[in-house]
Amino acid sequence: MIKPDGVSGNYTEEIKTIVVEAGFNIVKEMLTQLDKETASAFYEEHSSRSFFPHLVTYMTSGPVLVMVLEKRNAVSDWRDLIGPTDAEKAKISHPHSIRALCGKNSQKNCVHGSDSTSSAEREIKFFFKDVVSGDIATQQHDEL
C-alpha cells in the first residue's frame, strides 16, 4: 500500500516503477480514501498501542493506493525493497529503499508492507473481497 504521504507527494508512479523493476507483478490496484472505521479495522492489531489514534488520523488524511503484488518470495522481497519502518533510519542503513526515497519518519514512511504471508492474505482479502483463499494459497508464489 502506498500511504497518503506517498500519494500526495507524487511518488506513486516512481514507486510502481521500482516495484516492477524489482520483478513484481502488480496484479490489482485500487486508489481509495480510507475512513476512520476502515483504517481502524485494517490496523486493528495495533488498537491497544499508544500510536493507534495518530495512525488512524494519518491513514485517513488522504488517498492510499492499495496493490496486490505477486512474485516468488513476495513478502520478504517487498520488506527488503521498502526498508526499515523508520524512514530516517532507512536513509542511513538502506539508502536505496522506498522508505529512504520518500519517507519522513516512522509513521510517514510512504508504504505499508505485510509482515508475513498470512498477514498478506488477510490484507488482500480486506481490500479485495473477490480474492478467495485458494487463489493465494495454491499459487507458486507469495502475494501481498
Curated annotation (Swiss-Prot):
Entry protein name: Probable nucleoside diphosphate kinase 5
GO molecular function, a single term: ATP binding
BP-aspect Gene Ontology terms: CTP biosynthetic process; GTP biosynthetic process; UTP biosynthetic process
Major enzyme class: transferase
Catalyzed chemical reaction(s): a 2'-deoxyribonucleoside 5'-diphosphate + ATP = a 2'-deoxyribonucleoside 5'-triphosphate + ADP; a ribonucleoside 5'-diphosphate + ATP = a ribonucleoside 5'-triphosphate + ADP
Record organism: Arabidopsis thaliana (Mouse-ear cress)
Purpose: Involved in the synthesis of nucleoside triphosphates other than ATP. The ATP gamma phosphate is transferred to the NDP beta phosphate via a ping-pong mechanism, using a phosphorylated active-site intermediate.
InterPro entries: NDK-like_dom, NDK-like_dom_sf, Nucleoside_diP_kinase
PROSITE patterns xref list: NDPK_LIKE
Binding site for ATP: K3, F51, R79, T85, R99, N109
PANTHER family in UniProt: NUCLEOSIDE DIPHOSPHATE KINASE (PTHR46161), NUCLEOSIDE DIPHOSPHATE KINASE DDB_G0292928-RELATED (PTHR46161:SF3)
EC number: 2.7.4.6
Active-site residues, Swiss-Prot/TrEMBL: H112 (pros-phosphohistidine intermediate)
Any Pfam family matching the protein: NDK
Record-stated family: Belongs to the NDK family.
Coiled-coil zones: none
Signal peptide: none
Keywords: ATP-binding, Kinase, Nucleotide-binding, Transferase
SMART domains, alphabetized: NDK (SM00562)
UniProt keyword Kinase, yes or no: yes
Gene3D superfamilies xrefs: Nucleoside diphosphate kinase-like domain
